[in-house]
């Protein structure tokens, strides 16, 4: 299974990196390492997560309050967004629709 991180999702990851990096030096790298591990798990587990917002699957991160929203087309997982779950649900919905 291939994984493709779309531009907006890559920007979400960078934004998350800088948020955590400003909290504590090195925490941003730890954030990225964990989120990429979560994303990598989709090679095996893509499609088993619950669907949310406009038919996106939602993978919850194991270490951080972030969710990975993705779609599966044939043998490719498309990562559309990586969002902070602490945000207003209306904002999350708006961002994904």
Spans of model-derived segments:
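Short His-centered aromatic/hydrophobic patch
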Residues: 63
